[in-house]
Amino acid sequence: MARVTVEDCLEHVENRFELVMLSTKRARQLATGGKEPLVQWENDKPTVVALREIAEGLMSYEFIAEQEIVHEDPVFAAFEDESNEAV
């Protein structure tokens, strides 16, 4: 796809506001989250790649939410350990 238009993207999202939010989250994932693009990266910026993914119908809120789930250890796990108690 040579040029992405808003009309191409609006076929897959309900309105322009949702388009802005979805493309912003996806572009941030591509730029900083280490997520792999679903379309070929043709020397484009992350925002253009995100819009191309939306225009091709490959991106949705469900997909982004699924990728944002991170399984981490609890922040206070060290406090639960009895060996860390003050004497």
UniProtKB/Swiss-Prot annotation:
Keywords: DNA-directed RNA polymerase, Nucleotidyltransferase, Transcription, Transferase. GO terms for molecular function: DNA binding; DNA-directed RNA polymerase activity. Pfam families: RNA_pol_Rpb6 (PF01192). It catalyses: RNA(n) + a ribonucleoside 5'-triphosphate = RNA(n+1) + diphosphate. GO terms for biological process: DNA-templated transcription. Gene3D superfamilies: 3.90.940.10. GO terms for cellular component: DNA-directed RNA polymerase complex. HAMAP family: RNApol_bact_RpoZ. The RNAP catalytic core consists of 2 alpha, 1 beta, 1 beta' and 1 omega subunit. When a sigma factor is associated with the core the holoenzyme is formed, which can initiate transcription. Belongs to the RNA polymerase subunit omega family. This is DNA-directed RNA polymerase subunit omega.
